[in-house]
């Protein structure tokens, strides 16, 4: 091990000597800025390399004492980068593993960390009061879909149970920002993308060891980044590595069980399954409409603890099957951390989903209009479609290299019609021609963002019948026509209310599926 490698391996604390370490940060999004800000605070010499940058963040770099190299073409290492002589590179999640600058780093023998490894090494920065300077525990959550809902639920349960908790990671708050919060936390609930997981546990001294971890599901997604489903799944599996207490997996997704079986964990860590069927010992599931914990009780062979009921979830608008699965996963993580069953039940009675997640916009003339713009891949759209018996499906966008045939074939029988939006309509059109040739399929060919949803709503209204649901579940990313999934959802809701007349408060009030509103 070289002197430089020895120094990096020893950097496992906020209180270590980071001063003068030459670090290059790739990217200046939320994650990249948090990395640069943290390293500058530690006294490292920081150069940020990016192809584009938000003006405010670029200005702030100068304030914190970090240098910015902004260059549109990063197909080769810029001269300033090579002259800087980095001892370490910290990469933002958006950089592909085969990016030319990362290939250059590998050729030069320069270690590469992700933001999660850096945060893990620095996790002792702020310990909660009375902890004896012990850093916060980490509960890590990944999966193709349901991560954010599960993280929010888990964090809310932990908070209600008396813990000081921060939901962070891919949910929007950088983990490095959470570990630097001066108040300190007992536990971080960390949402991890496959991009972030790709970079963890690669370097001595930076091995993440979560208190508990969950992979909710695995399906085709981000294959353009990872190259194959196998590589994508391998990245997701890293969430379980070195787990201390619980590995929560999906009984309906055998890939997640294989991950647990094949992963090295801390001795004594348990595998905890969740599913919508009857649970076995050490699992969470449903018996006669009752959500049960058969994992965290003394007599789990013969009894179970009631958490809530499907009827109560239906009243709260949380009864869609994929949401129930998220609830069971979150309950397993919270119970692993010691949250009492009554706390779980109280949280579920008050919890509400974020906007654009199976959000009922209007019910008019027997037709439900539902916004699930958050369904940004086929797996999420599949879960959404399963919640409704007869659907006019508004679908399309950027498909990120995934296969659509299975999704269309699986749901053809429940479709009244389809309205295609987005840049990759030809892929959708072909899938419908192969698997639903008799289905009415219409297309929105508007290029201007403001015209897409009004046209889609008008076309959907022409196809729909009494009792149907018009469902925006795009199964695709939004960046071809919208700034993000939230804008796509907002414009859909506005178009629905404009077409039907009045606002969301006229006629039937907006609520969640099954809320009785």
From Swiss-Prot:
E.C. number: 6.3.2.9
GO biological process: cell division; cell wall organization; peptidoglycan biosynthetic process; regulation of cell shape
Binding-site list for ATP: 143-149
Stored InterPro entries: Folylpolyglutamate_synth_CS, Mur-like_cat_sf, Mur_ligase_C, Mur_ligase_C_dom_sf, Mur_ligase_cen, MurD
Keyword Ion transport: no
Keywords: ATP-binding, Cell cycle, Cell division, Cell shape, Cell wall biogenesis/degradation, Cytoplasm, Ligase, Nucleotide-binding, Peptidoglycan synthesis
Catalysed reactions, semicolon-separated: UDP-N-acetyl-alpha-D-muramoyl-L-alanine + D-glutamate + ATP = UDP-N-acetyl-alpha-D-muramoyl-L-alanyl-D-glutamate + ADP + phosphate + H(+)
GO cellular component, one term: cytoplasm
A Pfam family matched in the record: Mur_ligase_M
A GO term, aspect molecular function: tetrahydrofolylpolyglutamate synthase activity
Family to which the UniProt record says this protein belongs: Belongs to the MurCDEF family.
Function, as annotated: Cell wall formation. Catalyzes the addition of glutamate to the nucleotide precursor UDP-N-acetylmuramoyl-L-alanine (UMA).
Protein name as it appears in the record: UDP-N-acetylmuramoylalanine--D-glutamate ligase
Organism: Leifsonia xyli subsp. xyli (strain CTCB07)
Gene name in the database record: murD
């Amino acid at each position: 091990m070289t002197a430089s490698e020895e120094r990096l391996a020893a950097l496992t604390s906020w209180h270590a000597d980071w001063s003068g370490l030459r670090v290059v940060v790739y990217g200046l999004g939320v994650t990249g800025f948090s990395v640069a800000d943290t390293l500058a605070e530690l006294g490292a010499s920081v150069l940020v390399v990016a192809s584009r940058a938000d003006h405010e963040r670029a200005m702030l770099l100068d304030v914190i004492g970090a240098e910015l190299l902004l260059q549109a073409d990063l197909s080769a290492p810029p001269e300033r980068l090579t002259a800087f002589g980095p001892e370490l590179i910290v990469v933002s999640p958006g950089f592909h593993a085969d990016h030319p600058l990362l290939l250059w780093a590998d050729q030069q023998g320069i270690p590469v960390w992700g933001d999660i490894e850096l945060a893990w090494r620095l996790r002792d920065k702020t310990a909660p009061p009375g902890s004896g300077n012990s850093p916060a525990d980490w509960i890590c959550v990944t999966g193709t879909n349901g991560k954010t809902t599960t993280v929010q639920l888990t964090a809310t349960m932990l908070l209600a149970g008396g813990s000081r908790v921060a939901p962070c990671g891919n949910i929007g708050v950088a983990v490095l920002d959470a570990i630097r919060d001066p108040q300190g936390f007992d536990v971080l609930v960390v949402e991890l993308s496959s991009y972030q997981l790709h970079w963890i546990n690669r370097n001595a001294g930076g091995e993440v060891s979560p208190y508990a971890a969950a992979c909710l599901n695995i399906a085709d997604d981000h294959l353009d980044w990872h190259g194959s489903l196998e590589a994508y799944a391998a990245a997701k599996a890293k969430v379980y590595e070195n787990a201390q207490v619980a590995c929560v997996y999906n009984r309906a997704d055998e890939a997640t069980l294989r991950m647990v079986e094949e992963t090295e964990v801390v001795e004594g860590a348990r595998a905890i399954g969740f599913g919508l069927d009857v649970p076995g010992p050490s699992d969470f599931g449903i018996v006669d409409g009752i959500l049960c914990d058969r994992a965290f009780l003394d007599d789990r062979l013969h009894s179970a603890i009631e958490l809530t009921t499907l009827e109560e979830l239906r009243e709260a608008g949380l009864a869609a099957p994929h949401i129930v699965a998220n609830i069971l996963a979150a309950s397993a993580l919270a119970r692993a951390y010691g949250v009492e069953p009554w706390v779980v039940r109280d949280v579920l009675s008050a919890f509400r989903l974020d906007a654009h997640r199976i959000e009922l916009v209007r019910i008019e003339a027997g037709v439900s209009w539902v916004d699930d713009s958050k369904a940004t891949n086929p797996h999420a759209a599949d879960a959404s479609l399963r919640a409704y018996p007869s659907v006019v499906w508004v679908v399309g966008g950027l498909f990120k290299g995934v296969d659509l045939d299975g999704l269309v074939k699986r749901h053809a029988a429940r479709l009244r019609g389809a309205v295609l939006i987005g840049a990759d309509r030809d892929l959708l059109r072909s899938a419908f021609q192969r698997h639903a040739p008799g289905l009415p399929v219409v297309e929105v060919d508007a290029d201007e963002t403001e015209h897409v949803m009004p046209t889609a709503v008008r076309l959907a209204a022409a196809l729909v019948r009494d009792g149907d649901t018009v469902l925006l579940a795009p199964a695709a990313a939004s960046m071809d026509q919208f700034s993000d999934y939230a804008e796509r959802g907002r414009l859909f809701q506005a178009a629905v209310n404009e077409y039907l007349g009045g606002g969301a408060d006229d006629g039937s009030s907006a609520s969640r599926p099954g809320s009785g509103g």
